[in-house]
Amino acid sequence: MDVLYSLSKTLKDARDKIVEGTLYSNVSDLIQQFNQMLITMNGNEFQTGGIGNLPVRNWNFDFGLLGTTLLNLDANYVETARNTIDYFVDFVDNVCIDEMVRESQRNGIAPQSDSLRKLSGIKFKRINFDNSSEYIENWNLQNRRQRTGFTFHKPNIFPYSASFTLNRSQPAHDNLMGTMWLNAGSEIQVAGFDYSCAINAPANTQQFEHVVQLRRVLTTATITLLPDAERFSFPRVVNSADGATTWYFNPVILRPNNVEVEFLLNGQIINTYQARFGTIIARNFDTIRLSFQLMRPPNMTPAVAALFPNAQPFEHHATVGLTLRIESAICESVLADASETMLANVTSVRQEYAIPVGPVFPPGMNWTDLITNYSPSREDNLQRVFTVASIRSMLVK
């Protein structure tokens, strides 16, 4: 993997900097590095493909070295270099694709394609010029079963979940009380509602709670907490739990009271925030517990009192909500996030070449399925293919 990264980095630099008119002295170190790559690769043969619709391709390396010059690089020099660069870029692209479409239930962190296994041999270590990629660093750590750490922006840590629970229900569905939520990606939105606006509740207050368990521990997380859940702020028709009927939800938004968010790790509270909104942080956690209250307004103008009568029919439904959004965090496991396209790259390649469903990844690389059942085997394989996707993205956009 280190060698593949160094190949890609060298080729990217060569493609960007070996251009007509450039002073040789400005790129002499790069050309020496490029020639070392050629010396190491010359005389070797590789084969890629042969899975799904990915065609078999054979690769042979026998290239002349780039020479020295006292002046600027001329058109002939650049054309010779460009032909070599293009062949190598095509080779690296195919090695990456060949690796991204393979998976293994055992030791999935290790190279799975014949071509990358061969590049892992000792004779190619002379190509290992650069090991500065976060993905490469973490791949090396994971390969040695040491602690890794990925920094994510808006990590997709929450499997998609959209549902409701009813704490009070009637056959006519005209006087309900309960909780609705939508968890997806890096965001939780939860709303508590009471058709009667807590008219008969103790102290005219209803208590709500929403607990979300993460599939992986997050550390040093920056989080936004807002006293609103905009996705539940408009009328809708909701299917009943048994699917036999539907019920009408017509929210009128109130501000939540006594809001508390707890971040827990292995059942122990690590951080707690009460009535604090905006930006908060959490040290390390695997569970989030949100609790909040709906309090019937003690003093109401006639217009507000008309919204919340003391008896049925309840045409407007008192609702309070919270939004929790993980802006950034560190995780030992690789995740899809908002700042990278690794999941899309891997998924599109597997779809393009009609790769059959293997023993590890779900059909279509369904992220909700993958993160819901994030086994060690999936973690190893995902880190490997994401690392390869990051290498490929240096050359192929």
UniProtKB/Swiss-Prot annotation:
GO terms for biological process: fusion of virus membrane with host plasma membrane. It is found in: Virion. Residues 62-73 are annotated as: Interaction with the inner capsid protein VP2. Pfam families: Rota_Capsid_VP6. One of its GO terms (molecular function) is metal ion binding. The N-terminus is blocked. The keyword Heme does not apply. Ca(2+) binds at residues 266, 286. Zn(2+) binds at residue 153. Gene3D superfamilies: 2.60.120.170, Viral capsid alpha domain (1.10.1350.10). Keywords: Calcium, Capsid protein, Intermediate capsid protein, Metal-binding, Ubl conjugation, Virion, Zinc. The keyword Hydrolase does not apply. GO terms for cellular component: viral envelope; viral intermediate capsid. SUPFAM superfamilies: A virus capsid protein alpha-helical domain, Viral protein domain. The VP6 trimer contains a zinc ion located at the center of the molecule. The zinc ion is not essential for either trimerization or transcription activity of the DLP. Zinc-depleted VP6 has an increased sensitivity to proteases. Intermediate capsid protein that self assembles to form an icosahedral capsid with a T=13 symmetry, which consists of 230 trimers of VP6, with channels at each of its five-fold vertices. This capsid constitutes the middle concentric layer of the viral mature particle. The innermost VP2 capsid and the intermediate VP6 capsid remain intact following cell entry to protect the dsRNA from degradation and to prevent unfavorable antiviral responses in the host cell during all the replication cycle of the virus. Homotrimer. Interacts with the inner capsid protein VP2. Interacts with the outer capsid glycoprotein VP7. Interacts with the outer capsid protein VP5*. Belongs to the rotavirus VP6 family. This is Intermediate capsid protein VP6. It comes from Rotavirus A (isolate RVA/Human/Belgium/B4106/2000/G3P11[14]) (RV-A). The lineage of its organism: Viruses, Riboviria, Orthornavirae, Duplornaviricota, Resentoviricetes.
